[in-house]
Amino acid sequence: MTARPKKPSPQDGFFWKTKTLEQLSPTEWESLCDGCARCCLEKLEDEDTGRIYFTHVGCRLLDGDACACRDYPNRSDRVPDCVRLTPKEVRELTWLPPSCAYKLVADGRDLYWWHPLISGDPNTVHEAGVSVRGRVERTETEIPVEELEDHIVSWPALLPKRAKLKQRPR
């Protein structure tokens, strides 16, 4: 029995469908980030199981309203444990959210309707409920590390229903 032919995608021909992550230019790489800022939330790892838990506590450099780093060019110097994604890490990290465009592209999947490269609008990531806007309670500098467990939330690891739609709701 032969495999069913792959259904054509309306995104075929775009750079994220024609190149591997390793082949992307720096500009293309950066444009894949949808601006959700979920990766900028503090995470806890269970030492026994390795399971990752998200919190609603942002990195000290996260602007929760803008869903952007306050010092992106210098983030690694200012926050030593800030993860700078690489193609290798995209394929290995288990905590990237299901909506992460880097992960989608690595898996050969299409970007969602709300991704700015598809919608042409950087606000659709917020409209779809994917971003952290309005959901960051505090930053890591305001919460003692021993209290982070009290701030565990599940939503960053989930995809909101409206984000799963095939197109922008009218």
UniProtKB/Swiss-Prot annotation:
InterPro entries: Puta_zinc/iron-chelating_dom (IPR005358), UCP006173 (IPR008228). Pfam families: CxxCxxCC. HAMAP family: UPF0260. Belongs to the UPF0260 family. This is UPF0260 protein Rpal_2074. It comes from Rhodopseudomonas palustris (strain TIE-1).
